[in-house]
Amino acid sequence: MEKVPMTTAGFESLKEELRWRQQEERPRIIEAISEARAHGDLSGNAEYHAAKEAQSHNEGRINELEDYIARAEVINVSRLSGDKIKFGATIKLLDEDTEEKKVYQIVGDQEADVKTGKISISSPIARALIGKQEGDVIEVNAPGGAHNYEIIEVQYI
């Protein structure tokens, strides 16, 4: 069974989603199915079919979450250190073309969210950053073309 690297915060977030799906969403869906059944004929009952579809989606996500949680290799980022970039690092970059500064944290695939600055360990930019250090320049081939970034700061917070 292949381990999946994950930050402590990401692990807690997945556990909370699993709890919510099992203890709140599952009973709500079961109640919706029960109510729809009470309306009689199920063949043309859109409410029933929608509730059954929601149940299928929820149960699939529960199975997925249980798998990720079982395979999680939880890494406490605050205990990491060093000059080289690795999983969990928070990196401040300078886009050499636009002079725009960006801050990213390298996290596991399941906790990645570019809007909040969390990038997947398997993303092109994270792969380019791993093993580098402050002062290095990386080139990232993105859909919009190649970008050069200077690594300004590396932290483990």
Curated annotation (Swiss-Prot):
InterPro entries per UniProt? GreA/GreB_C_sf, TF_GreA/GreB_CS, Tscrpt_elong_fac_GreA, Tscrpt_elong_fac_GreA/B, Tscrpt_elong_fac_GreA/B_C, Tscrpt_elong_fac_GreA/B_fam, Tscrpt_elong_fac_GreA/B_N, Tscrpt_elong_fac_GreA/B_N_sf
User: Keyword NADP, does the record have it?
Assistant: no
The alphabetized UniProt keywords are:
DNA-binding, Transcription, Transcription regulation
Record the organism: Bartonella henselae (strain ATCC 49882 / DSM 28221 / CCUG 30454 / Houston 1)
Supply the HAMAP family for this chain: GreA_GreB
**One Pfam family from the record:** GreA_GreB_N
What this protein is reported to do is described as: Necessary for efficient RNA polymerase transcription elongation past template-encoded arresting sites. The arresting sites in DNA have the property of trapping a certain fraction of elongating RNA polymerases that pass through, resulting in locked ternary complexes. Cleavage of the nascent transcript by cleavage factors such as GreA or GreB allows the resumption of elongation from the new 3'terminus. GreA releases sequences of 2 to 3 nucleotides.
Q: Which domain of life is it from?
A: Bacteria
**Could you cite one Gene Ontology molecular function of this protein?**
RNA polymerase binding
Q: Can you say what this protein is called? A: Transcription elongation factor GreA
- May I ask which residue range the UniProt record assigns to the signal sequence? none
Provide the transmembrane region boundaries: none
**Which family does the UniProt entry place this protein in?**
Belongs to the GreA/GreB family.
Question: Where are the coiled-coil regions?
Answer: none
Query: What biological-process terms (Gene Ontology) are attached?
Result: DNA-templated transcription elongation; regulation of DNA-templated transcription elongation
